[in-house]
A protein has these predicted regions:
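Charged phosphate-binding loop/patch that engages nucleotide di/tri-phosphates or the phosphate backbone
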Residues: 127-158
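Hydrophobic/aromatic-rich, well-ordered segments within soluble, folded domains that form packed cores
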Residues: 36-71
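C-terminal end-helix/capping segment
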Residues: 12, 64-86, 148-151
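Mid-chain, well-packed structural core segment of small domains
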Residues: 76-125
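N-terminal targeting/disorder module
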Residues: 14, 19-21, 117, 121, ...
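Short helix-capping/linker segments at secondary-structure and domain boundaries
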Residues: 56-62, 123-136
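Short amphipathic alpha-helical segments and their helix-coil junctions
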Residues: 22-36, 95-102
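Extreme N-terminal tail/first-helix region
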Residues: 2-31
C-alpha cells in the first residue's frame, strides 16, 4: 500500500509491490541474482522483478505482470523497505562489474531491460527530494550505456 497526496488530497494507491518481494524471495532468487552480479555474468531469469521496467515496453505475460505503472509506482518501489535497498544493491553490483559490455554481462534482451530500468529509477529518484539517490542508477548508465538513458522509457514517462 502506498499513499500519494496529489494537490493536497489524500489518495491511497495499492501498487501490490509485494508481488516483487514474493518473486525475489521465491527459491532464493534475489540471492542468486546477487551472486550472478558478483560473478559478472547473469544466467538466471530474474530481470523482470529485480530491475523492473515501466509498463509499455515488454509484451510477455511476465513482463506485463512486473511492469511498473509509472514514476509514482517507481518511487514507491524505491521507498519500499525491502525492494528499495535490494534495487540499489543490485544496481551497485551491476555498476561494479569490472569488464564486459551490457550484452556480455546481461545478454540480450536483458541488456535492454537493464537500461530501461535504471533510466526509470534514475528519473524517479532524481525527482524525489534527494537527488543523490539517482547516482547509483546513473552509474549503471555510465558504465554500460555511455550515460545515455533509454529513449523509449523517457517517452513513456512523458
Amino acid at each position: 500500500m502506498w499513499t500519494v497526496r496529489p494537490a493536497g488530497r489524500l489518495v491511497v494507491v495499492d501498487f501490490d509491490l509485494e508481488r516483487f518481494v514474493r518473486a525475489q524471495d521465491d527459491g532464493g532468487t534475489y540471492e542468486a541474482a546477487v551472486a550472478e552480479l558478483r560473478s559478472g555474468r547473469k544466467r538466471g531469469h530474474w530481470m523482470w522483478f529485480v530491475f523492473p521496467q515501466v509498463a509499455g515496453l515488454g509484451s510477455s505475460p511476465t513482463a506485463r505482470a512486473y511492469a511498473l505503472s509509472g514514476l509514482d509506482e517507481a518511487r514507491a518501489y524505491l521507498a519500499h523497505p525491502v525492494l528499495g535497498p535490494r534495487l540499489r544493491e543490485a544496481a551497485q553490483l551491476a555498476a561494479a562489474v569490472p569488464s564486459g559490455t551490457a550484452s556480455e554481462v546481461f545478454g540480450y534482451p536483458d541488456d535492454l531491460k537493464l537500461r530501461s530500468s535504471v533510466t526509470l529509477f534514475a528519473r524517479a529518484a532524481g525527482s524525489a527530494a534527494d537527488d543523490a539517490g539517482a547516482a547509483v542508477f546513473t552509474a549503471v548508465l555510465d558504465r554500460y550505456f555511455d550515460g545515455d538513458p533509454d529513449p523509449r522509457t523517457l517517452d513513456l514517462l512523458r
